[in-house]
Every structure is written in structure tokens, then in C-alpha cells.
Curated annotation (Swiss-Prot):
Keywords: DNA damage, DNA recombination, DNA repair, Metal-binding, Zinc, Zinc-finger
Entry function: May play a role in DNA repair. It seems to be involved in an RecBC-independent recombinational process of DNA repair. It may act with RecF and RecO.
Zinc finger residue ranges, C4-type: 59-74
Organism in which the protein naturally occurs: Rickettsia conorii (strain ATCC VR-613 / Malish 7)
GO molecular function, one term: DNA binding
Gene3D superfamilies linked to this entry: 3.40.1360.10, RecR Domain 1 (1.10.8.420)
Annotated protein name in UniProt: Recombination protein RecR
Family, as annotated: Belongs to the RecR family.
Length: 201
């Protein structure tokens, strides 16, 4: 496909190419797919995005994304409210939910800490986490940050931060490969990592 001179189409391709996992070639294919059946494919996508923009909010408790200020996980009476899993982003929360093996609550950090940069730890929402641990009488905190250098740095920082709370602190099992991110692992691997979690000090 030759480069187009249409700036609007160029912009559409550029926006798609910025999505995770997509390069410029994949972005071109997606744009062409939508434009070839504009009345159905493109309009359906636009309508869905408009609805998502209107309805989706961040859970005021855990940081998940849902249609209510308290997400369906936090509000569910069937979850084990004595356990919290700490994840870096909503992507990792979704990965644990797909495993079907975790029935506790979550706390989404939204970021991680780099061992080489001077990021402010306040970005991790840890005061809110500590408040939840005391208010909800949490018995176990599972640190489910990724097995990257940043994830490990974040895990150690969280452990130090939570020392004043008596909850058991555990880490997902080492079956997750070094440098691995939960969102890219299959459900069986994530499920095993949850089951085989180890105390973390």
C-alpha cells in the first residue's frame, strides 16, 4: 500500500500505531479494514468508544475500571475481603481475573518504581492501601507486581511501607519468568503463580 496524502487517514493510522503491540503496518491494515466498510465497522467502533467515554470510570476504592464508582469486584459479596492483591495496572488485574483463581480484592498502583530513576513513591497510592488494610482488617497482601526490575523494586518498597501492618505479605510464585508481565501470560501460568505464592520479606 502506498503512502496516502490524505492527512485525516494519516492521522488515523498514526493513532492506531501508538496502541500497544501495533506497528505502522498493522495500523494501516486496521484503518483500511474500518474504512472499507465505513457505515458498519467504523460507525460501530465510534459509537462504542463514545459510550465507553461516557460510562467508564475509575473505581474510587481499588482503581479498577468499571461503570460505577465502586467496581463490581469491590462491591461483590462473594469476594474474600480479607485478601488484597497489589497490581501495577488494570491490565494485570484483568490477567488475574482471567485465571479464575483469585477471589480477593485488588489495589491498582497505576505505576511502578524504577531502580534507576527518581520517581516519587507517592504515585503508588500506598497511603490509600495502608488505610484499606487497617479499615478492612486485611489478613494477607499479595504483591502481584511484574517480574521486571521495576516490578521487583516496587515490591520491595511496598513491603517496607506495609511493615507497620500485621497482614501476611506474599509474592506470586517464581514460575513467572524474569522480566515477565502478567498480562502476557496464559491463564494457567497466572493461576499457578497465585496458588504457589510465597511469603515475601
Amino acid at each position: 500500500m502506498n503512502e496516502t496524502n490524505d492527512n485525516d487517514i494519516d492521522q488515523l493510522i498514526y493513532l492506531f500505531s501508538k496502541l500497544p503491540g501495533l506497528g505502522i503496518r498493522s495500523a494501516r491494515r486496521i484503518a483500511l479494514y474500518l474504512l472499507q466498510d465505513k457505515d458498519i465497522r467504523l460507525k460501530s467502533l465510534i459509537n462504542n468508544l463514545v459510550e465507553i467515554d461516557k460510562k467508564i470510570v475509575k473505581c474510587e476504592i481499588c482503581g479498577n475500571m468499571d461503570t460505577e464508582n465502586m467496581c463490581r469486584i469491590c462491591s461483590s459479596e462473594y469476594r474474600d475481603k480479607s485478601i488484597i492483591a497489589i497490581v501495577e495496572t488494570v491490565a494485570e488485574l484483568w490477567a488475574m481475573e482471567r485465571s479464575g483463581n483469585f477471589k480477593g480484592l485488588y489495589h491498582v498502583l497505576g505505576h511502578n518504581l524504577s531502580a534507576t530513576s527518581r520517581q516519587n513513591p507517592s504515585i503508588l497510592r500506598l497511603p490509600e492501601l495502608l488505610t484499606r488494610c487497617f479499615a478492612e482488617n486485611i489478613k494477607e497482601v499479595i504483591i502481584a507486581t511484574n517480574s521486571t526490575l521495576e516490578g521487583q523494586t516496587t515490591a520491595y518498597f511496598i513491603t517496607e511501607y506495609l511493615k507497620e501492618h500485621p497482614a501476611k505479605i506474599s509474592r506470586l510464585a517464581s514460575g513467572i519468568p524474569i522480566g515477565g508481565e502478567l498480562d502476557y501470560l496464559d491463564e494457567g501460568t497466572v493461576s499457578a503463580a497465585i496458588n504457589l505464592r510465597q511469603p515475601f520479606e
